[in-house]
């Protein structure tokens, strides 16, 4: 059964959920939660923490596929840029892990 990882990226809080297809065609939640980074850490350090924690999650559950929330237009450019950086780190981690 295929295990899918869904990710809602952010620098302070990145949400995730792992679901598996059930025999009846429905979805079964396997795990869900958030990856948190400390507010007092530098931006580069927070991105490294995000990468490391996401890699640990991938190594524990071995999802086959993933979906990452796309950016939406934000009035706060600083926030939009930070979320874009987090999304890039997530996409890098997924690619290096061989996840579609």
Residue ranges and their predicted role:
Residues 1-100:
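Phosphate- and other anionic-substrate recognition elements at nucleic-acid/protein interfaces
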């Amino acid at each position: 059964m295929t295990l899918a990882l869904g990710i809602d990226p952010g620098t302070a809080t990145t949400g995730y959920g792992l679901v598996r297809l059930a025999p009846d065609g429905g979805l079964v939640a396997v795990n869900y939660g958030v990856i948190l980074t400390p507010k007092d850490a530098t931006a580069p350090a927070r991105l490294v923490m995000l990468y490391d924690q996401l890699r640990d999650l991938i190594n524990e559950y071995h999802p086959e596929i993933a979906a990452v929330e796309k950016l939406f237009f934000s009035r706060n450019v600083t926030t939009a840029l930070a979320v874009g950086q987090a999304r890039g780190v997530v996409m890098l981690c997924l690619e290096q892990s061989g996840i579609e």
